[in-house]
Amino acid sequence: MRVPRPQPWALGLLLFLLPGSLGAESHLSLLYHLTAVSSPAPGTPAFWVSGWLGPQQYLSYDSLRGQAEPCGAWVWENQVSWYWEKETTDLRIKEKLFLEAFKALGGKGPYTLQGLLGCELSPDNTSVPTAKFALNGEEFMNFDLKQGTWGGDWPEALAISQRWQQQDKAANKELTFLLFSCPHRLREHLERGRGNLEWKEPPSMRLKARPGNPGFSVLTCSAFSFYPPELQLRFLRNGMAAGTGQGDFGPNSDGSFHASSSLTVKSGDEHHYCCIVQHAGLAQPLRVELETPAKSSVLVVGIVIGVLLLTAAAVGGALLWRRMRSGLPAPWISLRGDDTGSLLPTPGEAQDADSKDINVIPATA
């Protein structure tokens, strides 16, 4: 299931807070990015969370599944048995708080409420907590560690803070998480799964052409399922730089990433172009040639042949089942020559003398 993203105007906090950690491999931090929407589309969650260990997403949660789940290489982390149950319990509490916030705001909406909670280890190994919140893409509230409560200048911040403080020990739980639970979890992850932070997955590549405006074609160079997220795509024309085109980039549900770049060229000129990709998972830059129609046709033919073979196998199996159910031998047994009579005699055919019952007493004259 695809988790919905915040509205374009509500992406400010996410885009502001995450790029620094995504671009720094040595950034030792544990961050939870939480999002709630007041009017979710049918079949989509009202609340979802992504958890990040440094540059890697390690956790996902949404209100439809109701379970915290590991992502990417962290699926194989040797964690204690109760760890994910604890994550699930904590995030269900956060879900309740975020949805309660909409009640405090009234029914004017729609609203998108986001939060960034977590901690970062400084060079001297001390923990620096983070607790920021945004409403419809604008930061409006934080958690004051000295006061032990939420605060901000907006009236909405006051309304939400008062609502949350009515929840049993909510402020105390927030303070405990930021000062103690978060740094403990971060150090545990670094101890148990430090190798995961060195995970490198090279991209699967494809360069395709499609018709564009009259007289032009659009080349799209696509990279699939790679990690870390830093990747460079560029086009060459006859070996010369032709630009980077217009790009797209995003995360996958398994913790890897995808990216693409498109370039408009003259029709008939497509085969003069190639795509060059650079990534930490590749020993050297990879040259990606344009996918030809012939290759696509071979793929389609292979799929068709595979379907036909599967269909033939299914039909043959059904016919064999009907034959054996009616008492007839399997075809390969009927073709075994001399063995036929001794194994399964053909219906209506007399047995050989050697096959008669030796215990039968001959009739007396």
From Swiss-Prot:
Source organism of this protein record: Macaca fascicularis
Protein family per UniProt: Belongs to the immunoglobulin superfamily.
Membrane topology reported for the UniProt record: Single-pass type I membrane protein
GO terms, biological process: immune response
GO cellular component: endosome membrane; external side of plasma membrane; extracellular space
Glycosylated residues, chain numbering: 125
Pfam families tied to this protein: C1-set (PF07654), MHC_I (PF00129)
Top-level taxon of origin: Eukaryota
Subunit structure: FcRn complex consists of two subunits: p51, and p14 which is equivalent to beta-2-microglobulin. It forms an MHC class I-like heterodimer. Interacts with albumin/ALB; this interaction regulates ALB homeostasis.
Topological region Extracellular: 24-297
Molecular function terms, GO-annotated: beta-2-microglobulin binding; IgG binding
Keyword field contains Glycoprotein: yes
Alpha-3, as annotated region: 201-290
Gene3D superfamilies xref list: Immunoglobulins (2.60.40.10), MHC class I-like antigen recognition-like (3.30.500.10)
Annotated stretches, region: Alpha-2: 111-200
UniProt protein name: IgG receptor FcRn large subunit p51
Annotated ranges, domain Ig-like C1-type: 202-289
InterPro entries: Ig-like_dom, Ig-like_dom_sf, Ig-like_fold, Ig/MHC_CS, Ig_C1-set, MHC_class-I_related, MHC_I-like_Ag-recog, MHC_I-like_Ag-recog_sf
Major localization listed first in the record, in broad terms: membrane
Biological role: Cell surface receptor that transfers passive humoral immunity from the mother to the newborn. Binds to the Fc region of monomeric immunoglobulin gamma and mediates its selective uptake from milk. IgG in the milk is bound at the apical surface of the intestinal epithelium. The resultant FcRn-IgG complexes are transcytosed across the intestinal epithelium and IgG is released from FcRn into blood or tissue fluids. Throughout life, contributes to effective humoral immunity by recycling IgG and extending its half-life in the circulation.
Places the protein is found: Cell membrane; Endosome membrane
UniProt-annotated stretches for the region Alpha-1: 24-110
Signal peptide boundaries: 1-23
Residues with the Phosphoserine modification: 334
Cysteines engaged in disulfide bonds, as pairs: 119-182, 221-275
